[in-house]
Amino acid sequence: MKYLRHRRPNATLILAIGAFTLLLFSLLVSPPTCKVQEQPPAIPEALAWPTPPTRPAPAPCHANTSMVTHPDFATQPQHVQNFLLYRHCRHFPLLQDVPPSKCAQPVFLLLVIKSSPSNYVRRELLRRTWGRERKVRGLQLRLLFLVGTASNPHEARKVNRLLELEAQTHGDILQWDFHDSFFNLTLKQVLFLQWQETRCANASFVLNGDDDVFAHTDNMVFYLQDHDPGRHLFVGQLIQNVGPIRAFWSKYYVPEVVTQNERYPPYCGGGGFLLSRFTAAALRRAAHVLDIFPIDDVFLGMCLELEGLKPASHSGIRTSGVRAPSQRLSSFDPCFYRDLLLVHRFLPYEMLLMWDALNQPNLTCGNQTQIY
């Protein structure tokens, strides 16, 4: 009896182990009746874009306090004072960069768009319309947005996160750690030229423009195919025989403490212009030598002048908009834009409507209509 009592618990244990083994085997062989997620879903590839190698942060740039002693400094508006104090600063940390694949293959036309940090809607519309990265006539288009930071620290935290998400999703954001303002647009141009030298110097041509322009990129490619990227090209809406605006209230106010010259060199309106690889290199050389000037399109004209180059006019680039020949006609008629290269300015919804209209296969315009 003792022997039987001693074996009975072991037999029970063996039966229990056998039953558990059969149950486990059936679970492994038979598929589960519902999908069990054993681990979190993988991050989409666009969001898992690898972080670029860290670079040493530039040394902080300190204010040039000697400007405070200038007799006209105290009478200037705050944005002019800020410009004078930090005019010499040219190196800022790059907060968001683009993937190496952006310029890994030959780029025919690089779309370089100056954008304010909070202008998400404009950036998204450009990505969906004329700024979409694609091939036109077999030639590659690439898109970049140049962005700074918001001056308000609370707003900056929000938009910096927004730009981080955009960069991870689209890989088209270049953001530097400086306050994004009208007087800092030249700084954007200088920083981009520095970046391009090492990251995208192979781009044949560049469209440099604002995020509220409408660009007919198909027409641009057709036009640029007749030009050599190794020769000078800088075309837009030509502005000449003008000088600094001394009116205190003007957005373009430039006091004598900034420049005493009364004449600007010829330049193209900053809303949008086209340039070649050759000219981009020339601008880079000149920008390294010249003092930063607060009006970015004028500054680029100064760079061209220093290099012995001239900007040229192109009738298809309208940075001051389009006027219909008659008040009975709408200046928004897509037939006015069919043969143009670029028009400034467009509201976001207008950009989408114009892109849609120009891509309608049944668009009929008849004879060319003159515009102003």
UniProtKB/Swiss-Prot annotation:
Enzyme class per UniProt: transferase
GO biological process assignments: keratan sulfate proteoglycan biosynthetic process; O-glycan processing; poly-N-acetyllactosamine biosynthetic process; protein O-linked glycosylation
Bilayer topology term: Single-pass type II membrane protein
Keyword Nuclease: no
Glycosylation sites (chain numbering): 64, 184, 202, 362, 367
Origin superkingdom: Eukaryota
UniProt keyword list: Glycoprotein, Glycosyltransferase, Golgi apparatus, Membrane, Signal-anchor, Transferase, Transmembrane, Transmembrane helix
InterPro entries named in the record: Glyco_trans_31 (IPR002659)
Annotated tissue distribution: Expressed in colon, jejunum, stomach, esophagus, placenta and trachea.
Sequence ranges on the Cytoplasmic membrane side: 1-10
One example GO MF annotation: N-acetyllactosaminide beta-1,3-N-acetylglucosaminyltransferase activity
Pfam family, one: Galactosyl_T
TM helices/strands, residue ranges: 11-31
Gene Ontology CC annotation, any one: plasma membrane
Membrane-side (Lumenal) residue stretches: 32-372
Record's catalysed reaction(s): a 3-O-{beta-D-galactosyl-(1->3)-[N-acetyl-beta-D-glucosaminyl-(1->6)]-N-acetyl-alpha-D-galactosaminyl}-L-threonyl-[protein] + UDP-N-acetyl-alpha-D-glucosamine = 3-O-{beta-D-GlcNAc-(1->3)-beta-D-Gal-(1->3)-[beta-D-GlcNAc-(1->6)]-alpha-D-GalNAc}-L-threonyl-[protein] + UDP + H(+); 3-O-{beta-D-galactosyl-(1->3)-[N-acetyl-beta-D-glucosaminyl-(1->6)]-N-acetyl-alpha-D-galactosaminyl}-L-seryl-[protein] + UDP-N-acetyl-alpha-D-glucosamine = 3-O-{beta-D-GlcNAc-(1->3)-beta-D-Gal-(1->3)-[beta-D-GlcNAc-(1->6)]-alpha-D-GalNAc}-L-seryl-[protein] + UDP + H(+); a beta-D-galactosyl-(1->4)-N-acetyl-beta-D-glucosaminyl derivative + UDP-N-acetyl-alpha-D-glucosamine = an N-acetyl-beta-D-glucosaminyl-(1->3)-beta-D-galactosyl-(1->4)-N-acetyl-beta-D-glucosaminyl derivative + UDP + H(+)
Pathway listed: Protein modification; protein glycosylation
Subcellular location: Golgi apparatus membrane
EC number: 2.4.1.149, 2.4.1.146
Family: Belongs to the glycosyltransferase 31 family.
Functional note: Beta-1,3-N-acetylglucosaminyltransferase involved in the synthesis of poly-N-acetyllactosamine. Has activity for type 2 oligosaccharides. Also acts as a core1-1,3-N-acetylglucosaminyltransferase (Core1-beta3GlcNAcT) to form the 6-sulfo sialyl Lewis x on extended core1 O-glycans.
Descriptive protein name: N-acetyllactosaminide beta-1,3-N-acetylglucosaminyltransferase 3
Source species of the chain: Homo sapiens (Human)
Gene name of the record: B3GNT3
